[in-house]
Amino acid sequence: VDVKRLVCDFSAEIQNLKWTHDTLSFNTPSIDMLFESTDSTINGALHNEDLSLNFGSQVGLQQFIDKMTKCGNIALEQVNSISLNIDTLQSSLPPFACELEMGKRGIVQQFLGYNDIKMKKLSFELYNDTTIYGDGIIQGIDAYGTKIDTITARLAQVGKYLGYRFHMGNRAGTMDNFASATVKGGMLGSR
C-alpha cells in the first residue's frame, strides 16, 4: 500500500459469516473481495453466492477521484443552467466498466428479504469508454406485496444525445393495469 499515490493491492476472503443484531440475522458461506489500484488502473470485485460485482478503470485511483469530482461539478452547473451537454459530461467522466449480476442467494438478498423485497435476478452493466452505455434487467420482483415480472433499462449515448428505454413487462394476473409499458426518449442540451 502506498497511501500517498493511492496504490494498493488488497484481497480478502471471509468464510462462514454469521451476523445477528436484534431481529436482523445474516448467514453466508463466503464473501470474496479484491481491490487493486496502480498509477494507471483500478480493478475491484465482490463475490458472494449469487452476487458478482466487477469494476475496472483505465486510470489510477487519484485520477478517477479527480475526474468524478470534476464531472459532479459540471453536472451541477448544467442542471442549474437547465442545459445538459451529454458529450461534455461523458468526456469529464473517467473510463470505467461496471458489471453486476445477482440471483436469489447472498447477503444482499437476505437484507432485501428482511425488508420484504425479493427478486429472482438482477443484471446490470454500465460503461464509459468513448460513449456512455448501460443495460439492465430485473426479473421476478416482489416488493411489499407488489409483483412485477420484468423491468429492463437501456442507456446509449450518441454524441450530445443520451437515449434511454425503460420497459416493464408482466404476464396476465401481475399488475394487469400495467401489463406492458415502455418509455423511450432521450436527453439533449436545451434551455
Residue ranges and their predicted role:
Residues 1-66, 73-82, 96-191:
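Hydrophobic lipid-interacting interfaces of membrane-associated proteins
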Residues 82-92:
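Surface-exposed, low-complexity/disordered segments
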